[in-house]
């Protein structure tokens, strides 16, 4: 091989003429481009060899690469940028080799803000923070439709040239979002309330995804207002619309069931002052494919209009904006919850009988990436209603791992809800009526409150709690429904595993078994016992599996009343918190596939000893053919005379016409049976005809018409089976026999 290596240069010098010509052209072109370095274009061999060697050398020395780098240097667009930005006050530019950094000068006094407002129909804010692992995981399966929600009011606004806002300083962004100035010409309804100071650290993601304290002046909390004009268009991008559009006013009255503008909560709603943004969001979301994400519970501010919004749109209040679509913004810069790696569950603490909990634990143990989303507690006073909405989404996303807090939380929710019960219900109803599209029956906050109250009462059905608690520890959705409550001390903790859908499916599968008639979580309508499917159809081929709430409170309905209304209430809570009206809509309009009863997920990565797909039917019998050297003569048996005699009657008619002469030729009684078969040996398995398989009564088919042979085998087999066979040895057939063997004890195999 070394010799070959040494010879390598030789072939290069003797390269074919066509290759040499190509090289010459290339070099000539290079020379012309590089400014007259064409002297090297001589076609002599050594030069060409050098060119080839050079082209195979390091990239930095590659003539083509050199040429390209020189060409790029000539244009120097970065230089123009530098010069341009150097003249901008308050902007500092730093130039590295291939990087140009333009940032606001730290010490530079901020420019005097224009009339406290942005004069644009839409402002696009881009945010750069890298999404966390969970965000990336979720976005990987996120539907791309997120940016434009169908029917979202924003879509219908005049699209003015968007103003990308440099994300250089969060402070700048924040004011932008916060204070679409009252002066802004677009604002139609009410001047923006005084801009509430927002910490610079707060990010757009937070702005869009978390509840913010309501304005002290009673105007809608920044969160509510923000959702009014903030639309998330990407993992870290938002489109900002001026607040105060008429739609907001309309939505305000209708959409925020709990937070109706009139709601006594007043500023706390953060919705009263400004149009209930959540409602607007909801319409967007609603119009959007209902099932895109597990709708944040209707209670979320975005979903505040309890009735229509199928998903709480990524309203600020939504603790976990619909987990899939807005997750990155929510997780990357969100003060509503924090993400921690989840600890591995302790299998010893799980009761052996709790199969679901153990399967979930096993799943989590084997999961490569498991995270816990822990909601951060906020002062409920800021947005009593919003808080509840905020919580609901969490319920949707999170697995309530703290059922104990449920009672108090429920109570608080109930207390906060009474005001909502009246107006929100009516508003919701109106909203639903106007929004004919929103299938979800207006589930008034009152209803929710009532439902919550029910669970608040000590759950009599706690038998399931034993099972539920371990599961909750593992991230079994516990009080997710309850999560809809206003922010409560015990917030549900969400576990996100890389394979969470399997867990969810498993839980769902298990729950249906526990409660046969339990309505699916998804209906927001009084759950119908028939709907057990936990699958939320998110698009044409995507199904989101939302785990059924398994906490004792929820299970009470499941266990006590399979079909009862109480079950309905609990399930409805489930549905609301988990899916929202969208799911309901989908349930009513689309065929759910598959239903929960059809899905049984036993564990994500659990290795099953036996596949559950194996079809072991009595009809499928294996035919085992074995040859024992010591008893070969018993391997091939002929049916006994009596069995053949019985068959004869049946088969004579079929085979009479065929080979009559042959049948008569057979003389001995022992061979008479073969007349039926047209003197052919029948091979019977050694076990006897009972095991009649394909070979139990075999007649060489090449010797008779195929149709006859088919009929014969069909008829023979059943009769053969009835009587024990008679052992016979096989001897070579005589000339006049059609079969290859006859039964005369002469030849042993």
Swiss-Prot record:
Superkingdom assignment: Eukaryota
Biased composition (Acidic residues): 647-668
Signal peptide stretch: none
Single GO MF descriptor: protein serine/threonine phosphatase inhibitor activity
Residue span of region Disordered: 144-348, 502-586, 636-673, 730-749
Any one GO cellular component localisation term in the record: microvillus
Tissue: In the organ of Corti, expressed in the inner ear hair cell stereocilia and the supporting cells (at protein level). Expressed in the sensory epithelia of the organ of Corti and vestibular end organs and, to a lesser extent, in Reisner's membrane and the spiral ligament (at protein level). At postnatal day 2, expression is detected in cochlea, liver, brain, kidney, heart and lung.
Comp. bias regions, Basic and acidic residues: 337-347
Phenotype on disruption: Progressive hearing loss with progressive stereocilium degeneration, defects in stereociliary rootlets and mechanotransduction defects of the stereocilia. Fused stereocilia are observed in inner hair cells. Abnormal stereocilium distribution of actin-binding protein Rdx with diffuse Rdx expression throughout the stereocilium rather than concentration at the stereocilium base as in the wild-type. Significantly reduced levels of Rdx and Actb in the cochlea at postnatal day 30. Adult mice show almost complete deafness with slight to severe hair cell loss with aging.
Self-association state and partner proteins as the record states: Interacts with GRXCR2; the interaction restricts TPRN to the stereocilum basal region. Interacts with actin ACTB; the interaction may stabilize stereocilia. Interacts with CLIC5. Interacts with PTPRQ. TPRN, CLIC5 and PTPQR form concentric rings at the base of stereocilia and may form a complex. Interacts with phosphatase PPP1CA; the interaction results in inhibition of PPP1CA phosphatase activity. Interacts with DNA damage response proteins XRCC6/KU70, XRCC5/KU80, PARP1, TOP1 and TOP2A; these interactions recruit TPRN to sites of DNA damage where it may play a role in DNA repair.
Location, primary (coarse class): other
Protein name, entry field: Taperin
Name of one Pfam family that matches: Phostensin_N
Miscellaneous field: Reducing Tprn expression corrects stereocilium morphological defects and partially restores hearing in Grxcr2 mutant mice.
